[in-house]
């Protein structure tokens, strides 16, 4: 069985300060065969900035990919915040970048981040779940 991790965030993401090298070294220590960096890119995140400097991202990760080629397989991906208000921008962004892997995640519904709980105020559990599932369709 191959051991892989395809969901890793680095200092390129607003939610991490870790360096890609730290992740790579830890993955090797843990015996992983393959990893994929999937830093965030959200187009309308209401709290923090989840922009992604793709030029710097690909430059740093490509250099590390070459450096570690004999020790671990490294892929370059992205976690895109799915937001139907920005679907054209998202599709253009993904098409323009040579990502090996793309995760689509819902972080925001109706300009509200639900991680911090504001999204759930005044809603039943069923109402909140319905809005989430409708956003995924």
Predicted regions and their residues:
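An N-terminally biased module of ancient metal coordination in phosphate/nucleic-acid-related enzymes
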Residues: 1-84
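Extended substrate/RNA-proximal surfaces in nucleic-acid metabolism proteins
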Residues: 48-137
